[in-house]
Amino acid sequence: MPKKTIANLSRADVEGKRVLVRVDFNVPLDDAGNITDDTRIRAALPTIQDLISKGAKVILCSHFGRPKGKVVESMRLTPTAKRLSELLGQDVVMCDDCVGASVTEAVNKLENGQVALLENLRFHAEEEGNDPEFSKQLAANADLYVNDAFGTAHRAHASTEGVTHYLSPSVAGYLIEKELNYLQSAIENPQRPLAAIIGGSKVSSKIGVIETLLEKCDKLLIGGGMIFTFYKARGLSVGKSLVEEDKLELAKSLEAKASEKGVQLLLPTDVVVADAFDANANDKTVKIEEIPDGWMGLDIGPDSVKLFQDALADCKSVIWNGPMGVFEFDKFAKGTEAIAYTLETLTGKGATTIIGGGDSVAAVEKVGVADKMSHISTGGGASLELLEGKVLPGIAALDEA
């Protein structure tokens, strides 16, 4: 069911009202406590600015890191408040907690169009426990609720699900709306041919996605460490490459299912192997039938890149989730980089390209083509679960349109 969004709220609906907005400000920091990538903060700006312009009192809440229910000084949201103030061009009131009298006092002082940021939700264990009393306390300082944290929408926490029982309306922000539009339509109503590129090291973490995509897509391209489980299932020798021994039968059944459904399932034909898992290891490119004993595959080879590029050439929609190799090591990043450039070209020709969260986002950013993609998902696990066709609790809890 479509959900009510912030776009459905008029100025009259929110002016002078206290609006609790769940955002995802779980941003990376360096050792000195500086934000190294503010993408997630910038992603929430359209929703925040819309509420400011409509005269709302904006109360932002987010988790940061994994403090496990206690106050950890290095996990305070102070650096985030500072960066957000710079981006908005106005002071953001930083609260010293997310519930309680001090928060009520700070919120009561807000003028229309002002913004407050509550302290890290996960300083309270009740947040992840979706505790009703904590949800009620969180909701007590607000009149209505907006969820714009797609990255945590697959979790039923107090700030994503619990508060919706006490605040009405509860609606989706612009970021969640965009995520749903792209990810759901890519699966339910794509321009064809639809290709999915699935990478990463483990078949086990991508089983659900591969199974769902086999029902929906025309071509499925598989790269990353999981290819060796498929090769071993075919009876090939894979040296010291990563293999999930308990998933060999599954790999066979996925290949069988693809051919039964008429889905073109492509695996690399050559790989870059190394004699150690190391950025400076000795490396060579070999055909998949010729992986030497004691060596491990860490990237797809140039022939495979060409094979994948040819398969993608006529595609109108492409979903990419997971790198082709160990792209953190420059020596083994070529396959992943080539796919990123290929998608850039396809987008330029009118294809819809969706980067489905996690490491593939880091990859397109590293290559510098992130802004050339149709859509970059901000959720890792949430994107995967949505692509798997699962119901996300944080979305299900919102009002229906």
From Swiss-Prot:
Transmembrane segments: none annotated. The keyword Cytoplasm applies. GO terms for molecular function: ADP binding; ATP binding; phosphoglycerate kinase activity. ATP binds at K206, G297, E328, G357, G358, D359, S360. Keywords: ATP-binding, Cytoplasm, Glycolysis, Kinase, Nucleotide-binding, Transferase. It catalyses: (2R)-3-phosphoglycerate + ATP = (2R)-3-phospho-glyceroyl phosphate + ADP. Its EC number is 2.7.2.3. Belongs to the phosphoglycerate kinase family. This is Phosphoglycerate kinase. The gene is pgk.
